[in-house]
């Protein structure tokens, strides 16, 4: 056993989520959830000798060779510069579990569980779980500006949890002090996407709005009506597409956050085609075919399916799935007669093919 004789503790989200589930009367199996471990009294070389693989070079975090779970040496951190990465890390074998837990962001994330199942909770995290409170562990919280976005994301991830008043003061001070501009777009995007997948994504924006945290990275999302996002399935791509933004705002937001092109495409498709497709049985056949071609739906239905999932009406989604999608296969089979195709070249061929497919589609729509 690779962890034999190591002093290890389960920490972070697995412990937090189990305690939350227990309070809600839900069953949870910590062994099957995402788990992180802290190792006390060991060195990096000891873990390497056991076959663990170190992740990166800045932090003493290692992957278990079999489970691929993360094992981190107990460590302390000291601020030495601005931004998310400006820390000196001390992971010597003398760092205690209590010291390690003291560097964490929120009390609910600063609970450890020993091999005997006992909880080590020096900062009252279990009480804050009972009170549904997001509270910082110490004043060192302000040393990492990414924590502003993490707190907002936890508000979205954990329904009913509210930010403690004293933590709200720190968040506002960090935002007003322009600490957020030191973050990388990649880290902000990661928190943004996690929030979009959370049960209450609108809470992410509400918390950031309340602490002046939208202006540097998400100004387009200020004062938007976003509570409807939670009505749709927890897919970040779909929920990004549903943000009530115009094309210019989508482009600006995506460029600032270095968002993947698929997210921009989904938002643009929503603006261009969702209304038309929501009324597809009554749409002019030419307009419908042009939309389907623009979506490349005759070759790949991925973009069309995403638009279908954005629709509020289950009946409409079912009708697209049951009637329009199968119709695409038939539409692809509509081609020009060989003798006519042989006489056409260039744009003329495309126009003629469009004509026969519009005629076919018009007949199919009339028969619905």
Tell where the protein language model's regions lie, with residue ranges.
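Catalytic cores of the polymerase beta-like nucleotidyltransferase superfamily
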Residues: 1-368
């Amino acid at each position: 056993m690779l962890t034999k004789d190591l002093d290890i503790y389960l920490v972070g989200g697995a412990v937090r989520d189990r305690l939350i589930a227990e309070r809600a009367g839900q069953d949870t199996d910590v062994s099957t959830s995402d788990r992180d471990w802290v190792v006390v009294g060991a060195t990096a070389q000891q873990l390497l000798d056991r076959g663990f693989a170190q992740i990166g070079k800045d932090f003493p975090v290692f992957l278990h060779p079999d489970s691929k779970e993360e094992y981190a040496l107990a460590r302390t951190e000291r601020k030495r510069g601005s931004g998310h990465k400006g820390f000196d890390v001390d992971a010597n074998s003398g760092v205690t579990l209590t010291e390690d837990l003291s560097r964490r962001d929120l009390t609910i994330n600063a609970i450890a569980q020993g091999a005997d199942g006992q909880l080590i909770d020096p900062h009252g995290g279990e009480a804050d779980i009972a009170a549904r409170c997001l509270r910082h562990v110490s004043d060192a919280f302000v040393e990492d500006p990414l924590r502003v976005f993490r707190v907002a994301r936890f508000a979205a991830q954990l329904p009913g949890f509210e930010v403690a008043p004293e933590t709200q003061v720190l968040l506002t001070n960090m935002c007003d002090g322009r600490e957020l501009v030191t973050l990388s777009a990649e880290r902000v995007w990661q928190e943004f996407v996690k929030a979009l997948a959370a049960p209450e994504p609108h809470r992410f924006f509400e918390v950031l709005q309340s602490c002046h945290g939208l202006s540097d990275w998400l100004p387009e999302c200020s004062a938007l009506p976003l509570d409807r996002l939670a009505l749709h399935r927890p897919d970040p791509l779909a929920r990004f597409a549903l943000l009530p933004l115009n094309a210019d705002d989508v482009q600006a937001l995506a460029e600032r956050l270095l968002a993947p092109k698929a997210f921009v495409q989904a938002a643009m498709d929503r603006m261009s085609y969702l209304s038309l497709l929501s009324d597809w049985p009554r749409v002019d056949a030419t307009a419908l075919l042009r939309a389907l071609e623009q979506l490349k739906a005759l070759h790949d239905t991925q973009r069309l399916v995403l638009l279908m999932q954005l629709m509020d009406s289950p009946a409409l989604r079912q009708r697209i799935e049951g009637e329009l999608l199968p119709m695409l296969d038939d539409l692809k089979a509509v081609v020009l007669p060989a003798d006519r195709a042989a006489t056409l070249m260039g744009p003329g061929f495309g126009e003629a093919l469009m004509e026969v497919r519009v005629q076919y589609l018009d007949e199919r729509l009339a028969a619905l």
